[in-house]
Curated annotation (Swiss-Prot):
GO molecular function: ATP binding; ATP hydrolysis activity; ATP-dependent DNA damage sensor activity; mismatched DNA binding
GO cellular component: mismatch repair complex
Coiled coil: none
SMART domains, per database record: DNA_mis_repair, MutL_C
InterPro entries reported for this sequence: DNA_mismatch_repair_CS, DNA_mismatch_repair_MutL, DNA_mismatch_S5_2-like, HATPase_C_sf, MutL/Mlh/PMS, MutL/Mlh/Pms-like, MutL_C, MutL_C_dimsub
Name of the featured protein: DNA mismatch repair protein MutL
Species annotation: Rhodopseudomonas palustris (strain BisB18)
Length: 599
């Protein structure tokens, strides 16, 4: 068959295969056109997952008769001139969307420009244009697409169910709405209640309002503002506190010069920034906005324009990591704002009848006048068994028995319940602390600080502890011996299937070396060899901190509890343990009063 020029309709359908993959692609292209037209409100309607009908209405600048004539021709655009390909400032620029859509569907465009006496309408079916005719429209543009892919029936077989396609459309609109909080959006159709997002005020507060409307109240309550800037590149936005996580990275959004993009860059950068706060199987929710000179980023990577290429990707990644780490450190003592309130709201007073029971006869009830009954005695009259000598605990040297700690952020310790939780009284409520989670964070931060200064202090074991392990585990530990020694853990091979532990970190006190080594070996087996040394060392520190912390079930003396609270107040990131769980929750007196009907 000789080489020949393909007909224009066939060329457009081939191009449509890249630009119009599914109904969500159509919505994306049309909404981006509305944004580029300066719209302040965009209304979206879909039916049948976008297959049967898609309608986009905006109040933007509209098109003149001449512009409308060219708008459905390939590579005809008002957004680009001969020199601008490396300095793209609009969402669309290729001039392919409308002709591609018109080649595979029934397309109708009604538009009015301020310079025109009335609106104009144009219809395209399967690539064939109808004459432009006068129409009725006050201003802006209305685009309707029906019978998508009717001209290419084979494409219909690759679409998902209406529900799946509708959800893909909603996700596209959500991302565009997050990128432009200054524009009002509405979505209707698909037998769902209409969704409307009002235009938000300029600035960070308005952006957070829009993000909260889309990502939910939990995100709004736990959002941390972040920002970092260098060499003309600005990274800003909001990141959720470590206590708000998801099982996947779908809650991580990146916007570059107002364009929603999907980039593996953000996943790696966010994981690095949150490495001190979250377990490996949890992912935070973040929305980051990158602003830079348009000549420093290439948006012409793919026809769908969902990918970009940075001239200096390393700088962008470093700024993302710095912005997130700085924000997390600044809010390090913050707990999940919604946790305590949600729990309190679920409490209900119980009026169920009780069996006859004489509480005065209970052997645990102290009789008035006895030594155990002393309302004023408090902790001072109680005897509690403390830690074993040498066991790690909070530093009690700064504890002041006579001091009133209720004015401190974490208050004054009042009791310990279930030998696991410390209850402290603050000026306007109470705080409940998970003693293991809190101490784990303290030990971890001390290990990191020691590593950054003079190294971790070691304690030599008089008798080396021999730990029996399988040979693969022994090889793994010995191979990482230098990294372990950095943290004061010195191990040597001790014949087949065993290692000798000769030194341990002083900070851990008396620890179960066997359990620690098995845990470390398990984590090492999951490490990628490409994992940076710093990340590997942090994993080691986190594992050691977990093993070297106060365990649940240990009775604490009042001075130890108060010392732990004071250390938490002076330690960065003490609001979460190394696994992302909150170390404490705070209940305001007003919440407690509501629980008992006093408010």
């Amino acid at each position: 068959m000789p080489v020949r020029q393909l007909p224009e309709t066939v060329v457009n359908r081939i191009a449509a295969g890249e630009v119009v993959e599914r109904p969500a692609s159509v919505v994306k292209e049309l909404v981006e056109n509305a944004i580029d037209a300066g719209a302040s409100r965009i209304d979206i309607f879909t039916d049948g997952g976008g297959r049967r009908r898609i309608g986009i209405t905006d109040d933007g600048a509209g098109m003149t008769h001449a512009d409308l004539t060219l708008a459905v021709d390939r590579h005809a655009t008002s957004k680009l001139d001969d020199e601008d390909l490396l300095a793209i400032r609009t969402l669309g620029f290729r001039g392919e969307a409308l002709p591609s859509i018109g080649s595979v569907a029934k397309l109708s465009i009604t538009t009015r420009h301020a310079a025109e006496p009335h609106a104009w309408a144009l219809a395209v079916e399967g690539g064939a244009k109808s004459p432009i005719v006068p129409a009725a429209l006050s201003h802006g543009t209305r685009v309707e697409v029906s019978d998508l892919f009717y001209a290419t029936p084979a494409r219909l077989k690759f679409l998902k169910t209406d529900r799946t396609e509708a959800e893909a459309i909603r996700e596209v609109v959500r991302r565009l709405a997050m990128a432009r909080p200054d524009i009002a959006f509405s979505m209707a159709g698909e037998e769902r209640a209409p969704v409307t997002w009002a235009a938000a005020l300029p600035g960070a507060a308005g952006r957070l309002t829009r993000l909260g409307d889309i990502l939910g109240g939990d995100f709004r309550s736990n959002a941390i503002e972040v920002r970092s800037e260098r060499d003309g590149v600005v990274v800003e936005g909001f990141a959720a506190a470590p206590s708000l996580t998801r099982a996947n990275a779908l809650g991580q959004y990146l916007f570059v010069n107002g364009r929603p993009v999907r980039d593996k860059l953000i996943i790696g950068a966010v994981r690095a920034a949150y490495s001190d706060y979250l377990p490996r199987d949890r992912h935070p929710v973040v929305a980051l906005f990158v602003s830079l000179d348009s000549r420093e980023v290439d948006a012409n990577v793919h026809p769908a324009k969902t990918e970009v290429r940075f001239r200096d990707a390393g700088l962008v990644r470093a700024l993302i990591v710095h912005a997130l780490k700085e924000g997390l450190a600044r809010e390090g003592k913050r707990t999940a704002a919604n946790d305590a309130g949600a729990t309190i709201s679920s409490f209900r007073p119980s009026f169920a009848p009780r069996a006859n029971w004489d509480w005065r006869s209970s052997p645990s009830y102290p009789v008035a006048g006895s030594a155990a009954f002393d309302a004023a005695a408090g902790f001072a009259e109680r005897e509690q068994s403390g830690f074993d000598v040498g066991a790690p605990s909070a530093d009690v040297r700064s504890y002041q028995p006579s001091a009133d700690f209720t004015d401190r952020p974490l208050g004054a310790a009042r009791t310990q319940i279930h030998q696991t939780y410390i209850v402290a009284q603050t000026r306007d409520g109470l705080v409940v602390v998970d003693q293991h989670a809190a101490h784990e964070r303290l030990v971890y931060e001390k290990l990191k600080a020691s590593l950054a200064t003079n190294g971790v202090q070691r304690q030599i074991l008089l008798i080396p502890e021999i730990v029996e392990l399988d040979e693969a585990t022994v090889e793994r530990l010995v191979a990482r011996g230098e990294e372990l020694a950095t943290f004061g853990l010195v191990v040597e091979s001790f014949g087949p299937g065993a290692v000798a532990v000769r030194e341990t970190p002083s900070l851990l006190g008396k620890t179960d070396a066997g359990a620690l080594l098995r845990d470390l070996a398990e984590h090492m087996a999951e490490w990628d060899e490409a994992l940076p040394l710093e990340r590997r060392l942090l994993h080691v520190a986190a594992t050691m901190a977990c093993h070297g912390s106060v365990r649940a079930g240990r009775v604490l003396k009042p001075e130890e509890m108060n010392a732990l609270l004071r250390e938490m107040e002076d330690t960065p990131n003490s609001g979460q343990c190394n696994h992302g769980r909150p170390t404490y929750v705070e209940l305001k007196l007003s919440d407690i009063e509501k629980l008992f009907g006093r408010r």
